[in-house]
Amino acid sequence: MQSQFDKICKFKKFYKNDENEKYNIFVIPIFYYDKYRRLGPKGVYKNKSEERQLAFIRNLKANIENLHNGNIPSNWKFRIYYDKSLTNFEYEGVKVWNKLFSVISKSNKIQLIRFKCSRYYSCKKHCKLFGTLIRFHPLYIKEKNVISVNCIDSDNYISTKRLNELIKFIDSKYDINVFCSKYEFPRYKDLSRKDNFECYFRAGLISSKISFGEKKWDEAFADIDNPKSNFTKSFNNIIKHLKVFFPDEIQNKDNLYFEFGFDEIFLNYFIKNIIYKEKYKVRYVHYQPSYT
C-alpha cells in the first residue's frame, strides 16, 4: 500500500540496483534556496545562498573523489536527493549542477533521486528549507539492499575519523549511531519536554541500521500539518525559547516552519520518540562542540 506521503511526494530514481548487492548509503539533500540569510558580524544579515551552493559543490566533489579513490570502503554509496530548484542556480554563467550531475550520474556509487512534494511546492521550488527533511526519508523505508542509512549535511566532508566510527557502528550490536556533545546547547529542542537521551541530536550526524516504517513517516507529516497536534505545541515552545536565547535568529520571520533548524526539530521530536518507544540501542560518539 502506498503511503500517504508518497501520494503527495514523487521520487524519480536515476539509478539501478544489483539485486544481490548490499551497501551502506550516505544521504544528502541538495536544493537551491535563494533567501538563505544568516546573521553576520555586527548583527547584519547576509544572503549566503551562492556561498552555500558553492560549498555544497566543493564538498560533494571531494566526497565523491574519496568514494572512488580514497579510504571509503567499496560497499558505500552516496544518495543525493535533489529538486528542480537547482536549475535556478548559475555561477559565472554556468548551470553547475546540471554539469556535475551529468558526470556523476554515470557512477554506480552515486544514487540520484529527484523529489517533488506538491503540498510543499510552489513557484518551481519547495517551501524554504523543506528539502532538509527529505534526507530522513530512507530512515523510514525498508530497502533490502541497504545495510545502513547515514544522514549527512550537504556541506560536510566525510573525515577519516568519522568514517572509522561509522564502520565500527555497522559491525556493532547498536541500532542507531549519533555524533553529539553533552555540552552543546539544544538550540532547536523543546526544553519543556523530558529527554531520555545523553545529548542533543544533530540532523547531519545520525545513522541507522533499522527502518522506522513508512507509517511513522506519514504520522510525522500529519502532525506537522495539524495546528492542534502535540508537535505544534512543542514547536511553539521552541519558538518561545528562541525568542529568549536567539532573538536575532527569528526577527522578521512570520512563519518559522521549514526554516533553518526545522530538520533538527523534526529529529529531536519525531525520531527520538521512535527510538525511545521502540527501545532501539543508541551508540554515542561524543565530540567537542564548535561555538564558531
Language-model features: where?
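N-terminal anchoring/stem segment of glycosyltransferases
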Residues: 1-121
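Short beta-strand-to-loop element that shapes/binds the nucleotide-sugar donor at the catalytic cleft/hinge
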Residues: 173-210
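GT-A fold catalytic core of metal-dependent nucleotide-sugar glycosyltransferases
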Residues: 112-114, 128-184
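Short, solvent-exposed loop/turn segments at secondary-structure junctions
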Residues: 31-35, 85-87, 117-120, 156-159, ...
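A short, glycine-/small-residue-rich helix N-cap motif at loop->alpha-helix starts
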Residues: 56, 123-132
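Residues that flank catalytic or metal-binding motifs in active/ligand-binding sites
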Residues: 135, 152, 201-202, 263
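Short, hydrophobic/amphipathic alpha-helical patches that form generic packing surfaces
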Residues: 58-69, 137-141, 265-273
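Catalytic core and acceptor-binding pocket of nucleotide-sugar-dependent glycosyltransferases
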Residues: 203-292
